[in-house]
């Protein structure tokens, strides 16, 4: 058989059941109160969020405008500073004090010195070449002059020797002719000359025709003419040989 609880225990169990029911009722009431307060707080927080958003938005806009203004001021200030620096550099460049100008200028001056030295050396070499060429030309001209002088001397010597030889031949022929003429004059045995005879007593030249040559001159004149012709021929013959030569 099952054991039944006693009366005291039954009362305790009923009391516990009533207390649990009361506790459940209180819990439900507290939950309702909590949910109501939470709803009210949510409504209040939403209203506060909108106001805070607008306030923060206006603050951000004002800060952005302020930053833009500051940025414009800084940009203008930076522009003025850069402009003043550029003007100062321009003045330094004009006065040849700027490092951007003096350093490249020093390099250019050094390059100029080197190029001047190279140009001087090249000038010396060119002068040496011109001097050597001048000396060679001068030596060649002197040698050509000496050779031309020797050639001219030999030519003139040959011509003079030929003329002397011809003069010797002419002199010998003249000596022979003069001896022949003297012998002829002495053989006449008359003191009268041809010139002393009056023209009326001179014999007239015979009149001939054909290839005969009539000499109206005296023998001495003919001899002189013959000597002059030989001298002229002797003087003309070297020039003719020179003209016929290369």
Curated annotation (Swiss-Prot):
GO molecular function, one term: NF-kappaB binding
Biological process, per Gene Ontology: apoptotic process; negative regulation of DNA-templated transcription; negative regulation of NF-kappaB transcription factor activity; negative regulation of transcription by RNA polymerase II; positive regulation of anoikis; positive regulation of protein deacetylation; regulation of apoptotic process
SMART domains reported in the protein's UniProt record: Sds3
Record's GO cellular component terms: cytoplasm; nucleus; Sin3-type complex
Pfam families: Sds3
InterPro entries reported for this sequence: Sds3
Coiled coil: 51-98
Keyword hit for Cell division: no
Alphabetic keyword roster: Apoptosis, Coiled coil, Cytoplasm, Isopeptide bond, Nucleus, Repressor, Transcription, Transcription regulation, Tumor suppressor, Ubl conjugation
UniProt-annotated stretches for the region Disordered: 1-57
Modification after translation: Ubiquitinated by a cullin-RING-based BCR (BTB-CUL3-RBX1) E3 ubiquitin-protein ligase complex containing SPOP, leading to proteasomal degradation.
Annotated Acidic residues bias: 11-32, 40-52
UniProt note: domains: Contains an N-terminal anti-parallel coiled coil formed by two BRMS1 chains; this region can form homohexamers.
Assembly and binders: Homohexamer (Potential). Interacts with SNX6, HDAC1 and RELA. Interacts with ARID4A. Identified in mSin3A corepressor complexes together with SIN3A, SIN3B, RBBP4, RBBP7, SAP30, SUDS3, ARID4A, HDAC1 and HDAC2. Interacts with SPOP; this recruits the protein to a ubiquitin ligase complex containing SPOP and CUL3.
Function noted in UniProt: Transcriptional repressor. Down-regulates transcription activation by NF-kappa-B by promoting the deacetylation of RELA at 'Lys-310'. Promotes HDAC1 binding to promoter regions. Down-regulates expression of anti-apoptotic genes that are controlled by NF-kappa-B. Promotes apoptosis in cells that have inadequate adherence to a substrate, a process called anoikis, and may thereby inhibit metastasis.
Similarity comment: Belongs to the BRMS1 family.
Protein name from the UniProt record: Breast cancer metastasis-suppressor 1 homolog
Species of the source: Rattus norvegicus (Rat)
Gene this protein is translated from: Brms1
């Amino acid at each position: 058989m099952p054991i039944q609880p006693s009366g005291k225990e039954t009362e305790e169990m009923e009391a516990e059941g009533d207390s649990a029911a009361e506790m459940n009722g209180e819990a439900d009431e507290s939950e309702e109160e909590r949910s109501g307060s939470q709803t009210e707080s949510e409504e209040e927080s939403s209203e506060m969020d909108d106001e805070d958003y607008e306030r923060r938005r206006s603050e951000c806009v004002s800060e952005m405008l302020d930053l833009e203004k500051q940025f414009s001021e800084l940009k203008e200030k930076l522009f003025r500073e850069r402009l003043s620096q550029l003007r100062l550099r321009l003045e330094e460049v004009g006065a040849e004090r700027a490092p951007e100008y003096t350093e490249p200028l020093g390099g250019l001056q050094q390059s100029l010195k080197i190029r001047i030295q190279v140009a001087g050396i090249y000038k010396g070499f060119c002068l040496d070449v011109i001097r050597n060429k001048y000396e060679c030309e001068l030596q060649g001209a002197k040698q050509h002059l000496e050779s031309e002088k020797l050639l001219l001397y030999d030519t003139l010597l040959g011509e003079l020797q030929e003329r002397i030889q011809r003069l010797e031949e002419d002199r010998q022929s003249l000596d022979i002719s003069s001896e022949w003429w003297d012998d002829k004059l002495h053989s006449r045995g008359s003191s009268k000359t041809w010139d002393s005879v009056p023209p009326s007593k001179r014999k007239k030249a015979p009149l001939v025709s054909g290839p005969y040559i009539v000499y109206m001159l005296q023998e001495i004149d003919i001899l002189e003419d013959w000597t002059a012709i030989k001298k002229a021929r002797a003087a003309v013959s070297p020039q003719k040989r020179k003209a016929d030569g290369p």
